[in-house]
Amino acid sequence: AEAMAEAMADAMADAMADAMADAMAEAAADPPPGFIGVRG
């Protein structure tokens, strides 16, 4: 059970990191009005 919970936590963290990276890439490619980011 512990191993399962750990694997689940890992998978969740991976999915979250992926989603975050996707959202960041999207924001960088198409910044909303007033967005201050890497592109300034």
Swiss-Prot record:
S-adenosyl-L-methionine among keywords: no
Signal peptide (from-to): 1-3
Domain of life: Eukaryota
Tissue expression summary: Expressed by the venom gland.
UniProt KW Signal keyword: yes
Other comment: Is very weakly abundant (1.81%).
Record function comment: Venom protein with unknown function. Does not induce paralysis when a high dose is administered by intrathoracic injection into the blowfly Lucilia caesar.
Protein name per the record: U2-myrmicitoxin-Tb1a
Lineage, top ranks: Eukaryota, Metazoa, Ecdysozoa, Arthropoda, Hexapoda
